[in-house]
Design a protein with these regions (language model features):
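Charged, amphipathic alpha-helical segments and their flanking helix caps
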Residues: 1-34, 45-149
Length: 149
């Protein structure tokens, strides 16, 4: 699998989140940014398991992604974060990212992987990034695909 392309494709899928009109659009990046414009989603660390099937036919990637929200008002920031962490709805990161799975019989992420699954939310807390404090959380995304490509 082409990890750099997968990172960018996950970020591109997250851009489809629809936030309320009064809020800025979600910004997204495939890598940990030096600085952010909140709210911001980015692909951070990953773990890779090779050879989940014979002949390099399947590798598994576990991406840790983060979403950070500005804290102008702690309650409204957490409500916005909650909406992005929900399992469904126009602001749901899970829902918009899993649309990139493609239809039945299609490869995920525009052909970059066999499948993906947003598995869990963790680490709901205050984060410091580039000297500023944000409320945020991590989403774990499993991606499986051809090991030899």
């Amino acid at each position: 699998m082409q990890i750099s392309a997968i990172r960018e494709a996950i970020a591109e899928a997250a851009r489809a989140v629809v936030l309320p009109d009064s809020l800025p659009k979600l910004t997204c990046s495939g890598y940990v940014p030096d600085s952010i414009v909140a709210p911001h989603f980015f692909v951070a660390e990953y773990e890779q398991d090779f050879d989940k099937a014979m002949g390099r036919s399947l590798d598994e990637l576990m991406f840790t992604t983060r979403v950070l929200v500005g804290r102008a008002d702690d309650r409204s920031a957490q409500q916005l974060l909650d909406s992005m962490l929900s399992g469904s709805g126009p602001a749901s990161l899970k829902e918009v990212i899993e649309i990139a799975r493609g239809g039945p019989g299609e490869y995920a992420l525009g052909g970059l992987a066999h499948d993906l699954h947003v598995m869990r939310v963790q680490g709901y807390r205050w984060y410091e990034h580039a000297g500023a404090t944000y409320v945020g959380a991590e989403l774990t995304i499993k991606v499986i695909g051809e090991g030899s490509s």
